[in-house]
Amino acid sequence: STLMRSSAASDVYKRQVYRLIESGNEVVVFDNLETGHIEAVHPKTKFYKGDLRNRSEIDSVFDKEKGIDAVIHFAANSLVGESMTNPLKYYDNNLNGTKVLLQSMVAHGIDKIVFSSTAATYGEPERTPILETDPTNPTNCYGETKKSMERMFYWVEKAHGLRYVSLRYFNACGAHISGKIGEAHNPETHLIPIILQAAQGTRDHISIFGTDYPTSDGTCIRDYIHVTDLAQAHILAVEYLMKGGKSDIFNLGNGVGFSVREVIEKAKEVTQKDIKVVEESRRGGDPAVLIASSDKAKTVLGWKPEYDDLGTIIKTAWKWHSTHPNGYSK
């Protein structure tokens, strides 16, 4: 199959490109490299640098790359805090970018898309673990735009026959077991990389944002899922659509929650380093608990996560950070 990916140079998604190529697929990459790294792009991909909001740029790729079977859509701004202070940026990039992509797909007869969604669509859940049928009431603008993108796919299917799979994944983390591919954001915003930067000394401390949540230790609880398992889920979703599967939404998580304090303690155990912790006030838009039920993905897609142990996940990330203290920078 020939697949196009929006934003394949960004950190947590490049493992999926490697897996697609290892499985014999041709992959076309479209990315503006705003937050990604050209060094992370697989050498066997066809890479185009461009802005998804520019219709002529995405049209040009579809014109040149005939025979694209499906699109895997990752391109989006994804920082919860920033989305609360700069919501218009998120509506412009996430919603407008997706609209332009869909317009071009419809014009070029490409009718299958796998979408990178998020647990943030649920907001403060009524229960855990969260089911795909549970209410979606986002508590931040990032989650709101992702929910709106899902609705866009729904209506475009009604009008134009587009089939889609939306993968609502929980906290992506970890690194490739080789230690060659890992997370490198600028600025860094993900919990585990920040903790490990504090452990290796490239960061002074780790901040805990909120210690008064209604949880066992007062800190937020999240479901952590390894990027390799996320990568496999996207491949299975493409195969599902290629075989005629109907549009659907799937949660991707391990079904177990860990508090911020628990993650820090596990990182201390893995790294054998002391990690300075600073307690701060809550950030806007952070739900107290997010834990997934992924039974549907396991049943329908045949998804089987390999990494269900937090210590193992952190070990893979620590291997990356230990050998790449400056990320992809030389």
Predicted regions and their residues:
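Aromatic pocket-lining residues of Rossmann-like dinucleotide-binding sites
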Residues: L20
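Single conserved hydrophobic/aromatic residue that forms the stacking wall/gate
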Residues: S1-A9, Y13
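NAD(P)H-binding glycine-rich loop region in Rossmannoid oxidoreductase-like domains
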Residues: L52-N93
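Catalytic helix-loop patch of NAD(P)-dependent Rossmann-fold dehydrogenases
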Residues: T85-Q103, A107, D111-K112, T121-N171, ...
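Conserved mid-core alpha-helix of short-chain dehydrogenase/reductase
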Residues: E57, V100-S104, D229-Q232
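Rossmann-fold cofactor-recognition segment
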Residues: K44-N54
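Conserved glycine-rich Rossmann-like NAD(P)H-binding loop of the short-chain dehydrogenase/reductase
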Residues: N25-E34
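C-terminal substrate-binding subdomain of Rossmann-fold SDR/epimerase-dehydratase oxidoreductases
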Residues: D11, R15, I194-K330
